[in-house]
Amino acid sequence: MISVYGSTGFIGSHYCDLYNDNVIRINRNTRDPQSKDILYFISTVTNYNVFDNPHLDINTNLNVLVQTLESCRKKYDSDFTFNFISSWFVYGKSTLPAKESSSCNPKGFYSITKLAAEQLLISYCETYGINYRILRLCNVYGVGDKKSSKKRNALQHLATEVVRGHNINLYNDGKDIRDFMHVKDVCRAIDCVINCGEINDTYNIGSGQPNNFFELMSYVKQKTKSDSKFKSVEPPHFHKVVQAQDMFLDITKLKQLGFKQQISIHQGLDEIIETIN
């Protein structure tokens, strides 16, 4: 059994539903683990928190992590494995495809605290002799994300707008590159790393395929015969400062574990379209 922290979030809830017989959902108000295998999803999800609550990323991504590590250590000493969900945001602007060994140069509060959390985790685990794994996720999409917006799960948000015939704005002619993976495939990849991955190691989780927003939204428009029009706009200054324009991941290590993606990007978009219709 694996104790899942952050089981009510978009990815965490999908993971728990997919592997229901093997998970213990940890209440958000407690840090007490119920098994020696830990899967940790708790995190903020955007760099924009700095405008409303600059302490949120630090408190959530660092303080809560330390509290959880302490609870696990006090209960199990060093006899547990901590699987930490991180993000491609830690890379910042990087040579592509980004490898686990690539240098990290994050700029935003969220991105910086995710990298700091990785380093804190490694230091803590090495200090106490605890096993860990770090999983850096690509852009995760799929139906069921009630908080999707231009800043989070933008693919679902934009696809929804196109299906409904609304005009959309695309940064840089929609040519920004991202690595998208359906949430169910992401959960399968996470489970693959947990069961087959080396301990004390880092893994990229993604499709390994570069896609841009213009081509994907054009597919949605053609598929639904939408009247939506696309307008190219200049990204806000803050977006250009904290966000890499292009990103996709090298998933060689994930493939070596035997993982194979099951849902193509077009199949995932078709699912979104069907849900909206």
Question: Where are each of the predicted segments found?
Answer:
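N-terminal Rossmann NAD(P)H-binding glycine-rich loop of SDR-like oxidoreductase domains
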Residues: M1-N20
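Conserved beta-loop-beta element that borders a ligand/cofactor-binding pocket
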Residues: S86-S87, Q119-G144, N169
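Conserved catalytic-core motifs of eukaryotic protein kinase domains, centered on the activation segment
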Residues: Y48-L56, K93-P97, K146-K147
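NAD(P)H-binding glycine-rich loop region in Rossmannoid oxidoreductase-like domains
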Residues: R31-T60
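Conserved Rossmann-fold NAD(P)-dependent oxidoreductase catalytic core, especially the SDR/UDP-sugar
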Residues: V66-F109, R133
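Flexible, glycine-rich beta-alpha linker
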Residues: Y91-G92, G108-F109, R133-N153
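C-terminal substrate-binding subdomain of Rossmann-fold SDR/epimerase-dehydratase oxidoreductases
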Residues: V162-N277
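Active-site helix of classical SDR
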Residues: T113-A116
